[in-house]
């Protein structure tokens, strides 16, 4: 598989586990171009900070792992003006409201980063590698994403086909609610 992917937090954080899933490890080791959006960095840092309140030893281990990830040279995708504008359109869509705000009684409050990650995918025209398909499939129904790949299953759930097979065509995106 010679692809470029935007990593979702769940895929990156799988590598921090003591016994990561072998299928995810194989994906991370064989895909030559993996990109980390700043939204993922925020979620990882949020998780480490939350863990530090209850398990400082684990937080130190995760912090060391995070520093290793940062030194590994993964390209970091910053929130550019284009990403921010797309993110704003997605965040304003009432169909995606629960991804941005979440439910008051949810076990894990939402932080809106799946919508932010989708904005990166749309702006950069790159597929997302995720195991969190439900949220991204909802976004895809509203705003077709360039692709959703689940490395745990080694399966595409959404994949845009080229308009003309064998010919690269730059896609232009028009976002309207």
Please describe what each predicted stretch is.
Residues 9, 81, 111-115, 133:
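Conserved glycosyltransferase catalytic-site signature
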Residues 42, 81, 85, 115-122:
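A structural signal for well-ordered alpha-helical segments within the folded catalytic domains
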Residues 2, 31-34, 73-75, 122-127:
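Short active-site oxyanion
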């Amino acid at each position: 598989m010679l692809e470029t992917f935007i990593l979702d937090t769940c895929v990156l954080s799988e590598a921090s586990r003591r016994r990561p899933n072998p299928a995810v490890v194989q994906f991370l080791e064989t895909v030559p171009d993996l990109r980390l959006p700043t939204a993922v960095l925020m979620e990882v840092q949020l998780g480490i900070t939350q863990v530090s309140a209850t398990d400082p030893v684990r937080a130190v281990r995760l912090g060391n792992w995070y520093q290793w990830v940062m030194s590994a040279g993964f390209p970091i995708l910053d929130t550019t003006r284009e990403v921010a504008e797309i993110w704003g359109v997605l965040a304003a869509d009432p169909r995606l409201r629960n991804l941005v705000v979440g439910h008051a009684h949810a076990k894990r409050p939402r932080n809106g980063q799946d919508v932010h990650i989708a904005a990166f995918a749309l702006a950069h025209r790159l597929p997302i590698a995720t195991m969190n398909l439900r949220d991204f499939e909802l976004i895809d129904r509203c705003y077709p994403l360039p692709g959703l790949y689940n490395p745990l299953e080694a399966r595409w759930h959404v994949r845009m086909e080229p308009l003309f097979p064998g010919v690269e065509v730059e896609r232009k995106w028009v976002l309207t609610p």
